[in-house]
C-alpha cells in the first residue's frame, strides 16, 4: 500500500457492495450460531424428556459435527463450481430445516438425524460465507473480514441464550427450535441481492468449469471405492457418536478407519500438497478439542454444578458469547497487524492465564465469573475468527471453498469428541475440573501447531516440490516454508 492509502481509515477502503456482501454473510452466520447452540441450551430439558444418559445427551451436540465433513465437501464444491452465493443459500436452508425438525422430534433418533442435517448446513455456511467475504474484501483487510464474519456466530449464541431465558420457562424447549427458523426469510431475500465474490469471478471469467473435489472423488476413476468409503465413514461415525457403543477399543478402531478415509480423500483431491491438507485437519481437530468442551457443556456446568436458574445462566452465557464475538473482531485487527499466525499464538497464550480461575472461583459471584469468561473467551475462542483466513491461505481460489470446508469440518470432529470426552471425564471429576483441564492442556498443542506453521513445515519435509511459500490470500510468506535460522525474505513467491 502507498503512504496515502495507509493514512485512510481501514473502513473507507470498502465500498457499499463489499459492506452489503459482508452484512448478508454475517447475518447468515448469526442465524447459524443461533440455530446451532440451541441444543446446548436445552440439553438438560431434552435429556429429561427423552430419558437419555449424559453421554447420549452429549452425542446430540456431537451429531452436528459428524455430518459436517460431508457438508463441507459437497457444499464447498458447489461454491467452487457455481459460485459462493448459491452455496450460502443452500446451506442456510439446510440448517434451518434441521432446526425446525428438532422442534418436532418425538425421540432421540429423530433429533439425532435432524442434528445431522444442521451439521451439513453449518459446514456449508462456514466454508461458503468465509470464502465469499474474504475474497470480496481487499487483501490487507482479510483478517478483519474473517474475524468480523465469525463474530456473527457468537452473537447468534448470545441472542439464543437471551431468547432461551424468555421462551423455555413459559413455552418449553420445543418452542425455542420453532423460533430458530423465523429469520430465514429475510436472510434468503438479502442473499438474492448480493454480488458474487470478486476473486471467484476473476478466476472463472471466460474459463471452463473447474474440476471440483466432488468431481475428483465421485466422478473419477476411483468413484466406486470413494462412495463405499463415504458410506463406511458415515456408518462408523454413527456408531461412535450415537451412544450405542460402549467398547473403547471398537470406537478407537472405527475412529482410525475414518481418519484413513479422510486422509485418502485429501490425498486424492490435493495431490502432492496432501501433507499440508492433513496437517490443517490436525490443527482444526485440536482447535475444537480445546475450545468445544467449554462451548458445549458450559450451560450444563452452570445449571448443575453451580445450580444457576435459567435467567442467571442466560446472563453468564451473554458474557461468554459476547466475549467470543468481541474476540473475533479483536483477532481481525491483530491478524492484520501482527500477521495471522503470530496473532493466534499471542492470543491463546494470554487466554491460558484465565482458564483455571474461571472454573476455580465457583458460583458465588456471578459478575466476577461473567467477566472472567468474557476475557477468557475473547482471547481463547474469539481468535478462532481468523481461522478461515489461516486455512484458506493454503488453497488456491479454484479449490478454496471445498478445501476450507472439508479440511475445517473434518477437523471439527474434535467438536464431536469434545463434549463426550468432557462428560466421560466428569464421571470421575467434577465437570468444571474436567473442562478446565481439557482446555488448558490442549490449547498448548494448538499454540505449537500454529506457531511453528506445521502445515508448511511437514509439506517441506515430505513433498518439498509442491511447497507453497506464500499465503494465497494475502501474499505473506509462510514461516514454515524455510528451515530454522533461514530468512523469510529469501523465499521466492510461488504462483497461485
Swiss-Prot record:
It catalyses: N-acetylneuraminate(in) + H(+)(in) = N-acetylneuraminate(out) + H(+)(out). Pfam families: MFS_1. The keyword rRNA-binding does not apply. It is a multi-pass membrane protein. Keywords: Cell inner membrane, Cell membrane, Membrane, Sugar transport, Transmembrane, Transmembrane helix, Transport. The keyword Acyltransferase does not apply. It comes from the Bacteria. The chain crosses the membrane at residues 22-42, 58-78, 92-112, 116-136, 148-168, 170-190, 224-244, 247-267, 278-298, 313-333, 353-375, 406-426, 431-451. It is found in: Cell inner membrane. GO terms for cellular component: plasma membrane. CDD domains: MFS_SV2_like (cd17316). Its main location: membrane. GO terms for molecular function: carboxylic acid transmembrane transporter activity; sialic acid:proton symporter activity. Catalyzes the proton-dependent transport of sialic acid. Belongs to the major facilitator superfamily. Sialate:H(+) symporter (SHS) (TC 2.A.1.12) family. This is Sialic acid transporter NanT. It comes from Shigella boydii serotype 18 (strain CDC 3083-94 / BS512). The lineage of its organism: Bacteria, Pseudomonadati, Pseudomonadota, Gammaproteobacteria, Enterobacterales. The gene is nanT.
Amino acid at each position: 500500500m502507498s503512504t496515502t492509502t495507509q493514512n485512510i481509515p481501514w473502513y473507507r477502503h470498502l465500498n457499499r457492495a463489499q459492506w452489503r456482501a459482508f452484512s448478508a454473510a454475517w447475518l447468515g452466520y448469526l442465524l447459524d450460531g443461533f440455530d446451532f447452540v440451541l441444543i446446548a441450551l436445552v440439553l438438560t430439558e431434552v435429556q429429561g424428556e427423552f430419558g437419555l444418559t449424559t453421554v447420549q445427551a452429549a452425542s446430540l451436540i456431537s451429531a452436528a459435527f459428524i455430518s459436517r465433513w460431508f457438508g463441507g465437501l459437497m457444499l464447498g464444491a458447489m461454491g467452487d463450481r457455481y459460485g459462493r452465493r448459491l452455496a450460502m443459500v443452500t446451506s442456510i436452508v439446510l440448517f434451518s430445516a434441521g432446526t425446525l425438525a428438532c422442534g418436532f422430534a418425538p425421540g432421540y433418533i429423530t433429533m439425532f438425524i435432524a442434528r445431522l442435517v444442521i451439521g451439513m448446513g453449518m459446514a456449508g455456511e462456514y466454508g461458503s460465507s468465509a470464502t465469499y467475504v474474504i475474497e470480496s474484501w481487499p487483501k490487507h483487510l482479510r483478517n478483519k473480514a474473517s474475524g468480523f464474519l465469525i463474530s456473527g456466530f457468537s452473537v447468534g449464541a448470545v441472542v439464543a441464550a437471551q431468547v432461551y431465558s424468555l421462551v423455555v420457562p413459559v413455552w418449553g424447549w420445543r418452542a425455542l427450535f420453532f423460533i430458530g427458523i423465523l429469520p430465514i426469510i429475510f436472510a434468503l431475500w438479502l442473499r438474492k441481492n448480493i454480488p458474487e465474490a470478486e476473486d471467484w469471478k476473476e478466476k472463472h471469467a471466460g474459463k471452463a468449469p473447474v474440476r471440483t473435489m466432488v468431481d475428483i472423488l465421485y466422478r473419477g476413476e476411483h468413484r466406486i471405492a470413494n462412495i463405499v468409503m463415504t458410506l463406511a465413514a458415515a456408518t462408523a461415525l454413527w456408531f461412535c457418536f450415537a451412544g450405542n457403543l460402549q467398547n473403547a477399543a471398537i470406537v478407537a478402531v472405527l475412529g482410525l478407519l475414518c481418519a484413513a478415509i479422510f486422509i485418502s480423500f485429501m490425498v486424492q483431491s490435493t495431490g502432492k500438497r496432501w501433507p499440508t491438507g492433513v496437517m490443517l485437519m490436525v490443527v482444526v481437530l485440536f482447535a475444537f478439542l480445546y475450545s468445544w468442551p467449554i462451548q458445549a457443556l458450559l450451560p450444563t456446568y452452570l445449571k448443575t454444578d453451580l445450580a444457576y436458574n435459567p435467567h442467571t445462566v442466560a446472563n453468564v452465557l451473554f458474557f461468554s458469547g459476547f466475549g467470543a464475538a468481541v474476540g473475533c473482531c479483536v483477532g481481525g485487527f491483530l491478524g492484520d497487524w501482527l500477521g495471522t499466525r503470530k496473532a493466534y499464538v499471542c492470543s491463546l497464550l494470554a487466554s491460558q492465564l484465565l482458564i483455571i480461575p474461571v472454573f476455580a472461583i465457583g458460583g458465588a459471584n456471578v459478575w466476577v465469573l461473567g467477566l472472567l469468561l468474557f476475557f477468557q473467551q475473547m482471547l481463547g475462542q474469539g481468535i478462532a475468527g481468523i481461522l478461515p483466513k489461516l486455512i484458506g491461505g493454503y488453497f488456491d481460489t479454484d479449490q478454496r471453498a471445498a478445501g476450507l470446508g472439508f479440511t475445517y469440518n473434518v477437523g471439527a470432529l474434535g467438536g464431536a469428541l469434545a463434549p463426550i470426552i468432557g462428560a466421560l471425564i466428569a464421571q470421575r471429576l467434577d465437570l468444571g475440573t474436567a473442562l478446565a483441564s481439557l482446555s488448558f492442556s490442549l490449547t498448548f498443542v494448538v499454540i505449537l501447531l500454529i506457531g511453528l506453521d506445521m502445515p508448511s513445515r511437514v509439506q517441506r519435509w515430505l513433498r518439498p516440490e509442491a511447497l507453497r511459500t506464500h499465503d494465497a490470500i494475502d501474499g505473506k510468506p509462510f514461516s514454515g516454508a524455510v528451515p530454522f535460522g533461514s530468512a523469510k525474505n529469501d523465499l521466492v513467491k510461488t504462483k497461485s
